[in-house]
């Protein structure tokens, strides 16, 4: 997790961060923690290595989707409900998946405006401009689709396991990571 934090710090305020950079950051943070927890459960249950690895990959993908959902919530959740200020990541210079997608989809003039907002630091007017562009380019939906795809892949990792209450519980946890509002 420390590696992920350091990588994120090195990319703070960098509008040229790629989707691969972002995925590497979230893989080394929340996803690493959830993956380790799932792997430990398999080890303690004396499961074969194939199932241990499947559970670890399930945890990694759920952790990545959870972080994506958290990053998306930063731009859409009610501040009172979420418990943190709208646009907090932007204010801290964190370039997350929605901004990466916006920088891919926006026209050249809009890209320049977004880069300026990122480089100049947080201003409420900048956040409002970004939120308008998110709406114009359907960025929240596109970002949620990426997270949803990860959840589907995470569930597929558990195909080695027979249907059971435990497997269903893991599926519910995976689904919750996207449906939460806090």
Model-identified regions with their sequence ranges:
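All-alpha prenyltransferase/terpene-synthase fold signal
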Residues: 1-182
């Amino acid at each position: 997790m420390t590696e992920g934090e350091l990588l994120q710090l090195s990319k703070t305020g960098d509008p040229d961060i790629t989707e691969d950079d972002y995925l590497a950051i979230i893989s080394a943070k929340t996803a690493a923690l959830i993956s380790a927890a799932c792997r430990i459960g398999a080890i303690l249950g004396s499961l074969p290595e194939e199932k241990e690895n499947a559970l670890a990959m399930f945890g990694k993908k759920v952790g990545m989707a959870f972080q994506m959902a958290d990053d998306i919530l930063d731009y859409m959740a009610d501040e009172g409900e979420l418990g943190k200020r709208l646009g907090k990541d932007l204010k801290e210079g964190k370039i997350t998946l929605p901004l990466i997608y916006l920088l891919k989809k926006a026209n050249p003039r809009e890209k320049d405006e977004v880069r300026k907002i990122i480089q100049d630091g947080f201003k409420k007017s900048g956040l409002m401009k970004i939120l308008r562009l998110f709406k114009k380019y359907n960025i929240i939906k596109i970002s949620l689709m990426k997270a949803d795809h990860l959840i589907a892949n995470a569930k597929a990792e558990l195909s080695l396991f027979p249907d059971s209450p435990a497997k269903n519980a893991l599926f519910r946890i995976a689904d919750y990571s996207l449906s939460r509002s806090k």
